[in-house]
């Protein structure tokens, strides 16, 4: 017998919850969409290129949401490896600039696969933020 009950329901919100809390001054909603585009370039070592989801965000997003560009805003762009985590103090500063603070509740979503919102959720956890 399997138990299909989701046990971490405090980290997932419903559209009803979001609608009820959309006017909360401490709520920040972020579109975290990123695309990995497969490339068949024999000259490149990378099997894919990273493409920001900003164009998708510009076309449509949850009202009041802001956009987080994972690769450009929250990753070490000097690293030879994609999506390398920033140093904790730099990451905290970047998150603060996005309006994420001690009393903030952050809702993260991706328009494609959930891994991008999940990645940013984990980054928030690395600096001790647990209200996402």
Each predicted region: which residue ranges?
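Cytosolic catalytic domains that perform sulfur/thiol-centered chemistry
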Residues: 1-132
